[in-house]
Amino acid sequence: MLGVLLCWCLGASVLLYVLYSWLIPAAVQFNGSLALLWHDVIVERALDSLTRSTRPQRLLKAVKQHATRGDPQSVISAIDHFCRHREWAMNVGDEKGCILDSVVSELNPEKVLELGTYCGYSTVRIARLLPPGARLITLEFNPDYAVIARQVIAWAGIEDKVQLVEGASEDWIPRMKEHFGIETFDLVFLDHWKDHYLPDTKLMEGCGLLRKGTVLLADNVICPGVPDYLEYVRNSRSYKSCYFKSHLEYTRAEDGLEKSVFLG
């Protein structure tokens, strides 16, 4: 009887491992909503409970173990490897990250605003490409994420270009000119709460933070999606927009970036 029970437990354990490691991840690869539910809710909560740590903490540990201090590219590579082979995380990711890189390199901005820091992955991607003297202000609402992001930014050695600010975007955007001495931004990367994309864009317009030629680059416009934002920038005479088709980070589900040039 004991042998039967042990065999049953072993078989059940193997089945659960196969489901967790291969079958379910493979099944949700092409469906963005299911991928987010599986990776960003079910798996994250389970691992948080089992390890008594958070996903950002586990990501930071991987950076410190596998990335070279002071080497931004090695930090990016370490995070990408962690997210593809160990634990998914909602960074912009390697595929869309290349699109972000191309926009930053083409624009060569001196003043950049990032809305939504998370663990600092896109912050590092952007900052490593900025010219000398350039400035990147990144806003993060979640203080726990900000603690991790500061350490990732420091490990990458880009503190001289980055200023991380904790708080809500709607509170900080009106204070940008007075608090940071910023007149306008050359590039704004939107990757925070999706229902904030449109109101924050209108708030930046109203506060005079956008000049003719300012580029707004918005992530996750398909998955989870920002239909109200897309309708606005694609139909407004104040913007010229184009869509870069790609995939939700570290999956094969469709997602993309929307690049919108402010026309004044």
Swiss-Prot record:
Pfam family, one: Methyltransf_3
Cofactor note: Binds 1 Mg(2+) ion per subunit.
Cofactor: Mg(2+)
Tissues where the protein occurs: Strongly expressed in eye, diencephalon, spinal cord, hindbrain, liver, kidney and telencephalon. Also detected at very low levels in muscle, spleen, anterior gut and heart. In eye, expressed strongly in retina. In brain, expressed in the central part of the telencephalon, the periventricular gray zone of the optic tectum, the periglomerular nucleus, the olfactory bulb, and the region adjacent to the diencephalic ventricle in the hypothalamus. Expressed in gill, with strongest expression in gill filaments nearest the gill arch, and in esophageal epithelium.
MF GO annotations: catechol O-methyltransferase activity; magnesium ion binding
Primary residence: secreted
Sorted UniProt keywords: Catecholamine metabolism, Glycoprotein, Magnesium, Metal-binding, Methyltransferase, Neurotransmitter degradation, S-adenosyl-L-methionine, Secreted, Signal, Transferase
Domain of life: Eukaryota
GO BP field: catecholamine catabolic process; developmental process; dopamine metabolic process; methylation
Free-text function comment from the UniProt entry: Catalyzes the O-methylation, and thereby the inactivation, of catecholamine neurotransmitters and catechol hormones.
Family as reported in the entry's similarity comment: Belongs to the class I-like SAM-binding methyltransferase superfamily. Cation-dependent O-methyltransferase family.
Protein name (database record): Catechol O-methyltransferase B
Annotated organism of origin: Danio rerio (Zebrafish)
Gene giving rise to this polypeptide: comtb
